[in-house]
């Protein structure tokens, strides 16, 4: 087989002389038309620190591809800054951007008949967007993470961007003064890189390394360190070899790979968003995966890493302690991982991990041993009940009170909820309900970091529950339940909750229950009327029309016909 099985349709034969003429203008010579054409999907942007260092990595990828005998073609894709848009209408576009990224990469790579793709991303939706595209394309592909930010420092404390969100709640509750708030703001984000705890970006990069779609150690490197650029160039060379061997995403993204990724996410204490994104990727590649699979694996895998948001350390500390390979080796020797799963290098997981020690290094407490975990079971629990018949997702690590029954405080939007919290209207024992924030209802399934951080900052994190058909940031922790499905917009039971209703959240029993009779619930459902769409035109209108339930990954290309 040739090394350019797809691009030869635009580079070979007399009929393609005009095509070659245009390629010559962008740097192709006579000897280049038989080389594989590899796209570099470049997520560079100066709107967020997550992506502002990516262009330098794209240039290193370009150099690596040329050295390995390929012809690189660099193109841009978008990003939304979750952290900057958080708490605003702009956050509705965050999950939408995952689909735009996937669509854009698929469009360029198929339109230009590229033989492979190397995608570089930083902010949260860059990773799943790129992976969905790779799954659709099914051409040799590799993902390069832009890298994590280093921690900020203030008053002797390590900071992340979540520190700034929580400081708002602390300030509103009178726990810190304005000078401290300003000091945290100025020091939380010291430079380039994605948010530094085991938040969504670092969770997804870790998952992709565990699945074999990124190189070992690459998911926890700091954006500003030289090893990140070196790893990017090496990724390019590995991709060219994968093109020669025709190692495809469909061979890597198997059921075993998804189970490996879920296990690693549990072990590192990763974000609830990983559930949504892995469901979407699996749906795209055709691998059966459901919420129940996360619950099954959760009971087998302890939390091994003491990482923020609920823990002590940040991702650069994890990297120094051995990174994802060390975590994976512990899981492998304890029978959790599928060692025969293939990676983009052509090696199996077991072969990649062969030289990694079975135990974490001494003198550190970032990565714990199997026998001395941070928590005995995984932290991402799937809750069901009459409020979530399709399921919901809760992050239960660090929760001191895993059960709450209390009166509902109902809000139709995130903004109304945050205003009430900051005004002191939420009391210990309340269960906050934020609805019509789901994939269709928002639309866009916003993350609720602002209200959850305000609850934490106000000192109510152990005594107030929050449920929503929206999402949570990877920086969220506490007794919070998201991804409630069916969502309010389609008539899910969360739409039927009334102010003062008693709601039970029981993480141990994995129960989310509205404590009214079935007869009362049926009467309310009969009286419910669907709301009018919030957006009649534009991308949010299109998204609301197409998007599936969060229990299916909130994808936009199923059941279209």
Swiss-Prot record:
This protein's pathway: Amino-acid biosynthesis; L-isoleucine biosynthesis; L-isoleucine from 2-oxobutanoate: step 3/4; Amino-acid biosynthesis; L-valine biosynthesis; L-valine from pyruvate: step 3/4
Record-given protein name: Dihydroxy-acid dehydratase
Catalytic residue list: 473 (proton acceptor)
GO biological process: branched-chain amino acid biosynthetic process; isoleucine biosynthetic process; L-valine biosynthetic process
Reactions catalysed, as given in the entry: (2R)-2,3-dihydroxy-3-methylbutanoate = 3-methyl-2-oxobutanoate + H2O; (2R,3R)-2,3-dihydroxy-3-methylpentanoate = (S)-3-methyl-2-oxopentanoate + H2O
Subunit-structure text: Homodimer.
Residues bearing the modification N6-carboxylysine: 125
Record-level Gene Ontology MF annotations: 2 iron, 2 sulfur cluster binding; dihydroxy-acid dehydratase activity; magnesium ion binding
CC cofactor: [2Fe-2S] cluster; Mg(2+)
């Amino acid at each position: 087989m040739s090394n350019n099985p797809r691009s030869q349709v635009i580079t070979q034969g007399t009929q393609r002389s005009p095509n070659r003429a245009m390629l010559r203008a962008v740097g192709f010579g006579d000897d280049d038309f038989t080389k594989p054409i590899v796209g570099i999907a470049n997520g560079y942007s100066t709107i967020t620190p997550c992506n502002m260092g990516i262009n330098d990595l794209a240039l290193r990828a370009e150099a690596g591809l040329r050295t390995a005998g390929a012809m690189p073609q660099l193109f841009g894709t978008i990003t939304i800054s979750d952290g900057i848009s958080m708490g605003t209408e702009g956050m509705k576009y965050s999950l939408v951007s995952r689909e735009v990224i996937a669509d854009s990469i698929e469009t360029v790579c198929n339109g230009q008949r590229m033989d492979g793709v190397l995608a570089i991303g930083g902010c949260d939706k860059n990773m799943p967007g790129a992976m969905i595209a790779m799954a659709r394309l099914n051409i040799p592909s590799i993902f390069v993470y832009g890298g994590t930010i280093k921690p900020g420092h203030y008053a002797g404390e390590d900071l992340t961007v979540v520190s700034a969100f929580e400081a708002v709640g602390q300030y509103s509750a009178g726990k810190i003064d304005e000078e401290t708030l300003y000091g945290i703001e100025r020091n939380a984000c010291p430079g380039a890189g994605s948010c530094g705890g085991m938040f969504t970006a670092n969770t997804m990069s870790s998952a992709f390394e565990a699945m074999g779609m990124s190189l070992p150690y690459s998911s926890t490197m700091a954006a500003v360190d030289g090893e990140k650029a070196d790893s990017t160039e090496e990724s390019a060379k590995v991709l060219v070899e994968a093109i020669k061997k025709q190692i495809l995403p469909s061979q890597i993204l198997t059921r075993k790979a998804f189970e490996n990724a879920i296990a690693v996410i549990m072990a590192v204490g990763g974000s609830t968003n990983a559930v949504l994104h892995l469901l979407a990727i699996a749906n795209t590649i055709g691998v059966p995966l459901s919420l129940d699979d996360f619950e099954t694996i959760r009971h087998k895998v302890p939390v091994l890493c003491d990482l923020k948001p609920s823990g002590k350390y940040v991702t650069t500390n994890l990297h120094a302690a051995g990174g994802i390979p060390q975590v994976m080796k512990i899981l492998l020797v304890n029978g959790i991982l599928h060692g025969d799963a293939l990676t983009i290098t052509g090696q199996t997981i077991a072969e990649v991990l062969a030289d990694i020690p079975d135990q974490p290094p001494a003198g550190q407490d970032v990565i714990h041993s199997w026998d001395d975990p941070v928590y005995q079971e995984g932290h991402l629990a799937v809750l069901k009940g009459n409020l979530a018949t399709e399921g919901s997702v809760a992050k239960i690590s660090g929760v001191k009170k895993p059960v709450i029954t209390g009166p509902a405080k109902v809000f139709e939007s995130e903004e109304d909820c945050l205003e009430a919290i900051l005004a002191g209207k939420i009391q210990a024992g309340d269960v906050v309900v934020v609805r019509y924030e789901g994939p269709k209802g928002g639309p866009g399934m916003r993350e609720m970091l602002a209200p959850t951080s305000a609850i934490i900052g106000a000192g109510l994190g152990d005594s107030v529950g929050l449920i929503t058909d929206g999402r949570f940031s990877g920086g969220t922790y506490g007794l919070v339940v998201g991804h409630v499905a069916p969502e309010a917009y389609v008539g899910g039971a969360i739409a039927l909750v009334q102010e003062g209703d008693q709601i039970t959240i029981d993480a141990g029993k994995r129960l989310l229950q509205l404590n009214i009779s079935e007869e009362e619930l049926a009467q309310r459902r009969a009286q419910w009327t669907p709301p009018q769409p919030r957006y009649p035109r534009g991308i949010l209108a299109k998204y609301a029309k197409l998007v599936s339930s969060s229990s299916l990954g909130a994808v936009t290309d199923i059941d279209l016909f």
